[in-house]
Amino acid sequence: MTAVADKQKQRAYELDFLRGFALIMMIFMHSAWDIRYEYGVDTFGFLEADWFWAIVHPFFIVIFVGVSGICCTFSKNNLFRGLKLLGVAAGLALATWLITTYLKIYCLIIFNVLAMLAVSILLYSLIEKLEKTAKADPKLVNALIGMAGAFFAALGSKLEWLDYSTDNLIFLPVGFKMNSMPYMADYMPLLPWLGVFLIGCLIGRVCYSERRSLLPAKNKTAKAITAPVEFVGRHSLIIYLVHQPIVYGIMYLIFMLIRRG
């Protein structure tokens, strides 16, 4: 095996591709939402369909969050990663609060996918620390992670059917129903998505224990085809952060020119 092929084999490029593909679809859905609801263009009717919100939308989020859980098992310092991402999420929340409050552009984001992933990564960091300190059997830890993931995912899917409500905003990140839910441009609670993340962690611990790709090295043609999507997957954080203002800005200019014309 050549040095290039060995390097490619060591990096689980299939995870980059899956995360990149999921993020591209999320960007498309955000763009479609802006066009239909922000600019009033009667298109992308699938956004009104129950099947889209019940199947398609969750499907891509499951891929993105699950792969994030898998990748978490590759990291040597999840505490740092989690704190860094939490700082980014807090900065985004502050920025959107200022924009919403003073510019009257209603884009408030309190707890979105970045905050959810940050808390999940920090939780997994704690699990790693406890596992190492207690010298626990990895198989037992895997079983506990799997059961916790399945429980949180199942509980999250049933929350809306439970007869309860609360006024305490401290429960907003968890996913509990709020009596006075603030309008948010994006929202992703811990339930059920922490469960999906933990299931991803389990897959990473079991299937990617050697931290290597499960697929053979790609040839030049396959590499050329998948490289753009993998690039998006490798740089998902920065692309996620900048895509909405960029897309919204481009659309604003386009529709401004159309209306003037």
What are these model-predicted stretches?
Residues 1-261:
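Alpha-helical transmembrane segments and their immediate juxtamembrane cytosolic regions
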